[in-house]
Amino acid sequence: MITKAIVILSIITAYVDASAFLVYNYTYTLQDDNHRYDFEVTDYFNDILIKRLKLNSETGRPELRNEPPTWFNETKIRYYPKNNYNFMFWLNRMSETLDEINKLPETSNPYKTMSLTIGCTDLRQLQVNFGYVTVGGNIWTRFDPKNKRFSKVRSRTFPKVGMLTVKSQHWERVMEHLGSMVTLTCPFTADDYYKISKGYIDKPVKPTVTVTGIERGDNTTLICTFDNHYPSSVAVKWYNIEDFAPDYRYDPYVNELLPDTDYLPGEPGYPTITRRLGDKYLFTSSPRVMVPTIMSNRIACVGFHSTLEPSIYRCVNCSGPEPVLQYQGDRRNDLEDEED
């Protein structure tokens, strides 16, 4: 019953047939007050660095700073970004936009960095495409594929200047280079990376998932640990498992307990607290949430990884009361009986 409910509630989309975690990152950095700057583009697939391009201050052009993997062949990748990942386009857009942000009256201390992150991750029943902008290390805005524009994240608004607004004279190309990938093409691109890397990079490794609790008075921190997994991308959704019980409620939706973060499950930056284990391509992640201790056995983690079917994981050491999962009768019928 519970497993079936999770499958129904999961975001079911077409996904590639194996692990695919693709991230392009563009970072613009002001180095000093003399307007000297740096710009870097990185391409990672399943945590493997494919290319790192850095601005050559003497030539003003991108320069490759690493040796790409021998298996990498960009001619076999659909929708692969041309012109060195559109290096000069994003350099100019991000430079202009950060300059406009720093000129705003509300900007008391000028920002030094701006990053654009584009990509997607396949977590079986959870396919996430993302495109977002961070300024000064904090996420400012996310590209909304439904409305085809940047939108605010939960905790803040964002200045509609430069490349962040549909009024930009370059908006058509922003949509071409960013919008199309976030909205549509990223999973196909990631699938091509997977096909050409097959046999050359490590196979996905299924994590062991365990939920433990750290009790401090009236509150308990639940930790959903993914141990020894590859690639690094994981996500969790927290639910009150009593919502899955067949009882008197008529609400067809199960409410997710949202962690306090501006990132979406599966995005880089989502608070999974992921670290690499030694020199191997193995990772451990420990997303967490704080709940009232009385709820510690009722709140469950649904874990997502490219090797996992979504499953419910409950705390193994919590002291809260056990959840009530049996059928409790039909409130509507009870009320009708009282009226009779």
From Swiss-Prot:
Top-rank lineage group of the source organism: Viruses
InterPro entries named among the record's database cross-references: 2L_N_poxvirus, Ig-like_dom, Ig-like_dom_sf, Ig-like_fold, MHC_I-like_Ag-recog_sf
Record's signal peptide: none
Domain Ig-like: 207-294
Annotated coiled-coil segments of the chain: none
Sorted UniProt keywords: Immunoglobulin domain
Record carries keyword Manganese: no
Entry protein name: Putative Ig-like domain-containing protein C1
Organism: Swinepox virus (strain Kasza) (SWPV)
